[in-house]
Swiss-Prot record:
It comes from the Bacteria. Belongs to the ATP phosphoribosyltransferase family. Long subfamily. GO terms for biological process: L-histidine biosynthetic process. Feedback inhibited by histidine. Pfam families: HisG, HisG_C. Its cofactor is Mg(2+). The keyword Iron does not apply. This is ATP phosphoribosyltransferase. Catalyzes the condensation of ATP and 5-phosphoribose 1-diphosphate to form N'-(5'-phosphoribosyl)-ATP (PR-ATP). Has a crucial role in the pathway because the rate of histidine biosynthesis seems to be controlled primarily by regulation of HisG enzymatic activity. InterPro entries: ATP-PRT_HisG_long (IPR020621), ATP_PRibTrfase_cat (IPR013820), ATP_PRibTrfase_CS (IPR018198), ATP_PRibTrfase_HisG (IPR001348), HisG_C (IPR013115), N-reg_PII-like_a/b (IPR011322), N-reg_PII/ATP_PRibTrfase_C (IPR015867). PROSITE patterns: ATP_P_PHORIBOSYLTR. Its EC number is 2.4.2.17.
């Protein structure tokens, strides 16, 4: 580790959150050189060290105050929190921001040939999972007795290998379940990536840097959700055209050279503009419609 004056951020070394975590930091202006085998990357323009670790280790690094910030899936965070609590500890952290990537769900799944009516169908079954604490909490809340089978990977093969009757695993598209002759029957937890901070107070300098990063994260996320729209519109149809566009702020209206009937409208839309909306705009007389991505945005 470098000197403690540098902000330490833990991210997943490899896996589904790794690439998008690096992209987020880069879009926030954190310049760094990532080497595949290196566990630490040093920012070249900000006093920040990026620690690349297993995702299961990130919550503990935050709970124990080893790192200052972490980007982690809510499922891993809460599983580790419940595990610490089961050992009599009281882990703490600050949730700074839920992020716009890493979406998945933790679901119960059964073999395709099994009939499913309700959760009582899981009574007494042996369930394989990598998230025993989240599963235990859900089953307890629903009054279901079951047998736990904790696996650290390849959970979906457990029924076929006669290790378990059912599974509780992460699902994104469902393709892996189908490939293993399983069907998703109940979502027990919805998850996405989040940015967390250790509970202990940071130095004044570090906190100022965190505040700056949070402002940039908000700007990046807002830019991803927004589009810059430019079009020409008849003056008499402005109200109808604006009603079709969900804007962040009031649009900018500009005169067109040598055209008394039409104006140019520029605005930031907070939603993606679908073809149906563009067609509706055209029906109201709009023309020269341009929809552009926004790289950065600060309100």
């Amino acid at each position: 580790m470098q000197e403690n004056t540098r902000l330490r951020i833990a991210i997943q070394k490899s896996g589904r959150l790794s690439k998008e975590s690096i992209e987020l930091l880069s879009e926030c202006g954190v310049k760094m050189h990532i080497h595949e085998q290196s566990l630490i990357a040093f920012s070249t323009n900000l006093p920040i060290d990026i620690l690349r670790v297993r995702d299961d280790d990130i919550p503990g690094l935050i709970f124990d105050g080893v790192v200052d910030l972490g980007i982690i899936g809510e499922n891993v965070l809460e599983e580790n929190e419940l595990e610490r609590q089961s050992l009599g500890e009281n882990p703490s952290y600050k949730l700074l921001k839920k992020l716009d990537f890493g979406y998945c769900r933790l679901s119960l799944a059964l073999p395709q040939e099994n009939k499913f009516q309700n959760l009582k169908d899981f009574e007494g079954l042996r369930i394989a999972t990598s998230y025993p604490q989240l599963l235990k909490r859900f089953m307890k809340e629903n009054g279901i007795n079951y047998k736990n089978c904790t696996l650290t990977g390849s959970v979906e093969v457990a029924p076929r290998a006669n290790l378990a009757d059912a599974i509780c695993d992460l699902v994104s598209s469902g393709a892996t379940l189908q490939a293993n002759n399983l069907k998703e029957v109940k979502v027990i937890y919805e998850s996405r990536a989040c940015l967390i901070q250790k509970e202990n107070a940071l130095s004044k300098e570090k906190q100022a840097l965190v505040d700056k990063i949070m402002l940039r994260v908000a700007g990046v996320m807002q830019a991803r959700e927004s589009k810059y729209i430019m079009l020409h519109a008849p003056k008499e149809k402005l109200d109808k055209i604006q009603a079709l566009l969900p804007g962040v702020e009031r649009p900018t209206i500009l005169p067109l050279a040598h055209d008394e009937k039409n104006v140019a409208l520029h605005m930031v839309s907070k939603e993606n503009l679908f073809w149906e909306t563009m067609e509706a705009l055209k029906e109201e007389g709009a023309s020269s419609i341009l929809v552009l991505p926004i790289e950065k945005m600060l309100k």
